[in-house]
A protein has these predicted regions:
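...with weaker cross-activation on analogous glycine-rich loops/strands in unrelated enzymes
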Residues: 4-7, 73-155, 160-163
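Active-site nucleophilic cysteine motif
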Residues: 44-64
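Glycine- and charge-enriched low-complexity intrinsically disordered segments
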Residues: 155-181
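Short, Lys/Arg-rich amphipathic segments at extreme N-termini
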Residues: 39-48, 164, 172-175
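Active-site-proximal loop/helix of nucleotide/amide-processing enzymes and allied scaffolds
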Residues: 1-34, 41
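Surface-exposed patches in mature extracellular/periplasmic domains of secreted proteins
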Residues: 68-72
Length: 181
C-alpha cells in the first residue's frame, strides 16, 4: 500500500502513526508523523484535506508565516447557497479590496462537477504577481499568475485573467499582508 498525500497530511494533523491497508490485495504500510508537508504545486486533490482552501492556508503559512484557521467544510457546500469564504473571511483576518497585489485571496464562482454553476462562490486562489514561491526553490517566474487547486485536479499556477477574472466575485487581503509585495 502506498500512502497518498492526503494520508500523509492527515497523519501529521493527528500526530499519531497510521496503518494503511491496500484494498484489494491486503498490502500494508505504516507512516508516522515526520513533518511532511504536501507540495504547493502538483498536489493531489482531496476535499477538506487537500483542496483550494487548504492550498491557501499552506501558502500563507509557508510564504508569509500567517496561520489561517481550518474551517469545517463538507463536500458540495457551495450548492447550499452559503458562501463559506464570505462567512469566514473576516474571522480569518481578511478584508475586501478593489485592487490586486501579490498575496491577495481571489474568490471565484466556477462551474462545479458536471458543469453546473454553484449557488455560492466555491473556489479560491492566491495571486502570485511574479509567480514565484519562496518555498519552492528554482521555480521560474510567471508574471500575472495565481496559485489554485481545482476540484479533482492537481494544484497549479495559471495566468490570472480571462475566465478566472470574469468568475472572480471578491478580492481579499489579509490584515497582516506585507505593505510592499
Amino acid at each position: 500500500a502506498t500512502p497518498s498525500m492526503a494520508d500523509r497530511v492527515s497523519c501529521e494533523l493527528h500526530g499519531v502513526p497510521w496503518f494503511i491497508l491496500g484494498w484489494p490485495g491486503g498490502d500494508t504500510a505504516t507512516i508516522k508523523p515526520e513533518g511532511y508537508e504536501a507540495p504547493l504545486l502538483e498536489r493531489e486533490f482531496h476535499h477538506g484535506i487537500l483542496d483550494c482552501y487548504a492550498l491557501v492556508r499552506d501558502w500563507y503559512a509557508r510564504e508569509w508565516g500567517i496561520d489561517l484557521p481550518n474551517f469545517p467544510r463538507r463536500d458540495g457546500w457551495w450548492n447550499d447557497g452559503e458562501s463559506l469564504y464570505e462567512r469566514y473571511c473576516e474571522e480569518a483576518g481578511f478584508y475586501r479590496v478593489g485592487d490586486l497585489r501579490k498575496g491577495d485571496l481571489v474568490v471565484m464562482q466556477i462551474a462545479a462537477q458536471g458543469g453546473s454553476m454553484p449557488a455560492a462562490p466555491n473556489h479560491a486562489g492566491v495571486y502570485l504577481g511574479d509567480g514565484l514561491l519562496s518555498s519552492v526553490p528554482g521555480l521560474h517566474a510567471a508574471p500575472g499568475t495565481f496559485l489554485h487547486h481545482r476540484y479533482g485536479k492537481k494544484s497549479s499556477r495559471d495566468v490570472y485573467g480571462g475566465m478566472w477574472a470574469e468568475r472572480t466575485v471578491m478580492i481579499l487581503r489579509h490584515q497582516r499582508a506585507p505593505e510592499e509585495t
